[in-house]
């Protein structure tokens, strides 16, 4: 299987399956001298891990990460950083009934068609369990970006089903299980999720991720444009079916006079572009949105085929998230941070001596 790595100078390679022995990753390109401990990574892993609220899967994984290499005396050495998380709460028997049946809306059918076989236990490599390692690697990127470049990456749930969540207060995002920035929507979210769970159904969501403090100049036209790489990274997250940068698809209804981000001596008058112009960061906040589909692992019967080509009805058993978007916030942050650090290092390597002719606001 190819496609397990992302990045050029800052490069992340993950391995492992949902019900395998462990998950792991190799992080290459971390400059030496960055103070780094397990606790630095655990903060974001705890934000992503399952079983933390009634609104997420009840699979209980501690997700305790181990740093195997690349750190000595509490600082990075510049060599490859090896990370490992052991799986401890697998219930493979929950999936024994689907080993010969293709769950609709899942990767079962496509993996079998591509490889001729599949690990049916929790989806194997296609499971979102893999994203734990992205979050661990992303925590390294987030720390370096903040310490060395003053860049901060953070995200929030901006919509769950029909309920929109406006950015009212960043400070409350980490105080509720939805990562919602609007306190007036918490009761509605709770009521909606309770009804959804009773129904045995699932729902989609929208997550917004923002990077502040990004300098102008990141991005490598034409094929490694910053927005192109961000879209690629965010689209690689399980269940993501759409990515928007800035105003995204809303620009279809805008006129040029409305969409252009005019420039004055005080700076940009707006940020419809989401902080990227011509594939290069403008110095404004980078803003991206992702749309996540509702999981097909629900307790309502649906039609599918088995390996013999026979039509069957099936109900997915096991422990699943009724809304995968809730736990996607730290994953989206991680993917944006990985891309930004890769481009920051590339910019420093090629254009580190360039003096911008204009000030950055």
Curated annotation (Swiss-Prot):
GO CC entries: cytosol
Cofactor note: Reduced FMN (FMNH(2)).
Residues holding NADP(+): 48, 54
Residues binding FMN, per UniProt: 125-127, 238-239, 278, 293-297, 319
Cofactors required: FMNH2
A molecular function (GO) term: chorismate synthase activity
Alphabetized UniProt keyword annotations: Amino-acid biosynthesis, Aromatic amino acid biosynthesis, FAD, Flavoprotein, FMN, Lyase, NADP
Subunit structure: Homotetramer.
Pfam annotation, one family: Chorismate_synt
Recorded coiled-coil stretches: none
GO BP term, example: aromatic amino acid family biosynthetic process
Described function: This reaction introduces a second double bond into the aromatic ring system.
Lineage: superkingdom: Bacteria
Broad EC category: lyase
NCBIfam families: aroC, PRK05382.1
EC number(s) reported in the record: 4.2.3.5
Reactions this protein catalyses: 5-O-(1-carboxyvinyl)-3-phosphoshikimate = chorismate + phosphate
Organism this protein belongs to: Proteus mirabilis (strain HI4320)
Family the UniProt entry places it in: Belongs to the chorismate synthase family.
Protein name: Chorismate synthase
Keyword Membrane: no
Pathway: Metabolic intermediate biosynthesis; chorismate biosynthesis; chorismate from D-erythrose 4-phosphate and phosphoenolpyruvate: step 7/7
């Amino acid at each position: 299987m190819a496609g397990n790595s992302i990045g050029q100078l800052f490069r992340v390679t993950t391995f492992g399956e949902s019900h395998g022995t462990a998950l792991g990753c190799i992080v290459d390109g971390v400059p030496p001298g960055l103070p780094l401990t397990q606790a630095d990574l655990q903060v974001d892993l705890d934000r992503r891990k399952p079983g933390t609220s009634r609104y997420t899967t009840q699979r209980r994984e501690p997700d305790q990460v181990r740093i195997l290499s690349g750190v000595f005396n509490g600082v990075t050495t510049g060599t490859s950083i090896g990370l490992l998380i052991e799986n401890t709460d697998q219930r493979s028997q929950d999936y024994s009934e689907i080993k010969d049946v293709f769950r609709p809306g899942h990767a079962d059918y496509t993996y079998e068609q591509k490889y001729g076989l599949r690990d049916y236990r929790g989806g194997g490599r296609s499971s979102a369990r893999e994203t734990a390692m992205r979050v661990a690697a992303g925590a390294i990127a987030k720390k370096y970006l903040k310490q060395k470049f003053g860049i901060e990456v953070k995200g929030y749930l901006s919509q769950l089903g029909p309920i929109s969540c406006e950015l009212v207060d960043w400070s409350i995002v980490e105080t509720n299980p939805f990562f919602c920035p609007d306190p007036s929507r918490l009761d509605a979210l709770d009521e909606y999720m309770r009804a959804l769970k009773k129904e045995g159904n699932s729902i989609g969501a929208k997550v917004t991720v923002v990077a502040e403090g990004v300098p102008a100049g990141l991005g490598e036209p034409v094929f490694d444009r910053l927005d192109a790489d961000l879209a690629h990274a965010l689209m690689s997250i399980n269940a993501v079916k759409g990515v928007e940068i800035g105003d995204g698809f809303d620009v279809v209804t805008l006129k040029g006079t409305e969409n252009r981000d005019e420039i004055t001596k005080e700076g940009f008058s707006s940020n419809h572009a989401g902080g990227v112009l011509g594939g290069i960061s403008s110095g404004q906040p980078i803003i991206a949105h992702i749309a996540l589909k509702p999981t097909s692992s629900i307790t309502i019967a649906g039609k599918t085929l088995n390996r013999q080509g026979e039509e069957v009805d099936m109900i997915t058993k096991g422990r699943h998230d009724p809304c995968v978007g809730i736990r996607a916030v730290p994953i989206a942050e991680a993917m944006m941070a990985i891309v930004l650090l890769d481009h920051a290092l590339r910019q420093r390597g090629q254009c580190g001596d360039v003096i911008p002719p204009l000030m950055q606001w």
